[in-house]
């Protein structure tokens, strides 16, 4: 009887520990929107040079979202959405502040800014608002949400690896989060850019792991 009770106590403690670890982790989906993920998205057509890598990233994001929902891991949807005329970017003369209005992407009422159908938010999942920059934290309520929910471990998926995913990685590190890129659930424009970020940049600000490694870690 004592042995059964001890076994039960150990089982409950292990499950409690797992719940605590999962409760301190969240997945941030960077721009899992039609602009990137839909075959007719402007940015996918304009910028993605490696369709194989892109398709693989979409499949893995779908796996991660499904796994997270089944295992109560918070999903945070961090898109970009701008008002008509892009007043948030204040007539930018260079960089993304110039490129986004020129391309006409991420308009609030447009098809491209909508979340991709297979991974769109469901009831109870947090949607970041206010974001105006490359980092998911710029101008947004992401940081306050993470802190209010005691989240310490941030896992990043989405687009594009060498732009907004990397910017969010750096920013999260500076804000003292433990940050991870799920490497095969992101995509750069081409393989060279992807490998450069993973091999030369990530280790300064966090770690990277594969979808399989993430799922095995969280089981």
At which residue positions do the language-model features occur?
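Sec-dependent N-terminal signal peptides
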Residues: 4-14
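Active-site-adjacent betaalpha module
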Residues: 19-26, 36, 62-71, 88, ...
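A short alpha/beta connector and helix-capping loop motif
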Residues: 23-25, 40-68, 73-75
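N-terminal nucleotide-binding beta1-loop-alpha1 segment
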Residues: 28-31
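Short acidic, Gly/Ser-rich segments with clustered Asp/Glu that frequently serve as metal-coordination loops
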Residues: 33-39
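Short glycine/proline- and charge-enriched loop/turn segments
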Residues: 42-49, 93-101
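Short beta-strand segments at enzyme active-site cores
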Residues: 73-80, 182
